[in-house]
Amino acid sequence: MSALCPLLTPPASEALLLAQARQLSGYTLGELAAMAGITTPKDLKRDKGWIGVLLEIWLGASAGSKPEQDFAALGVELKTIPVDSLGRPLETTFVCVAPLTGNSGVTWETSHVRHKLKRVLWVPVEGDRSIPLAERRVGSPLLWSPSEEEDRQLRLDWEELMDMIVLGQVERITARHGEVLQLRPKAANSRALTEAIGARGEPILTLPRGFYLKKNFTQALLARHFLLQNP
């Protein structure tokens, strides 16, 4: 059996990507970091994206923070998801930054959200705060595309939220809007403002917003897969 090592180039097929992701299952983050020659931080307070970066290294991801998918040649996006001991998501999942201007003519079919969620490699990771970061284990991966019903749910929420943005109501949107998709501020500090449309159609400055999948959506998705896999 060959020794486990990070992919130095992007995987050439979904099968190779999934095979590599499956090999990581059961390892701790500390073990994977040590084998990849990178330091494990004490916690994620200042390194929020560290787990994603670690898995990108192991899986040969290419996109970084660019708008295309992490595995652009395959059209696959990588999403790590912290879960509790029962495999339930512990937080919402960031999808992409929301465009607050220039949205005339935009449709669900051509949206960034749909593009990012067309094909996703979900990698659950132990997220219980009581487990030291280095000791948290990587779970079994799932390669997923939205079902017709999931696509419909996402589209309805996206259309409602985009209508509010276009109509100058971005400041009225709360995390409670949307059944499975929410829009909320995404900024490291409250001084990072971006242009948006105000209630009277005037340009305003507001916090950047991001689209996030709600926990009920990802929980149902993971439960369906892993319950089918482990009857």
From Swiss-Prot:
Subcellular locations according to the entry: Cytoplasm
Alphabetized GO MF terms: DNA binding; endonuclease activity
Keyword Oxidoreductase attached: no
Write out the GO cellular component annotations.
Answer: cytoplasm
Report the CDD domains cross-referenced here: MutH-like
Write down the SUPFAM superfamilies for this protein, in alphabetical order.
Restriction endonuclease-like
The record ties this protein, via InterPro entries, to: DNA_mismatch_repair_MutH, DNA_rep_MutH/RE_typeII_Sau3AI, DNA_rep_MutH/T2_RE_sf, Restrct_endonuc-II-like
Q: Looking at the record's lineage, which domain of life comes first?
A: Bacteria
Query: Which Pfam families has this protein been placed in?
Result: MutH
Q: Which UniProt keywords apply?
A: Cytoplasm, DNA damage, DNA repair, Endonuclease, Hydrolase, Nuclease
Alphabetical GO biological process terms: DNA modification; mismatch repair
The parts of the chain that form a coiled coil are: none
What coarse category fits the chief subcellular location reported for this protein?
cytoplasm
Q: What role does it play? A: Sequence-specific endonuclease that cleaves unmethylated GATC sequences. It is involved in DNA mismatch repair.
Q: Which family does it belong to?
A: Belongs to the MutH family.
User: Would you tell me the protein name for this molecule?
Assistant: DNA mismatch repair protein MutH
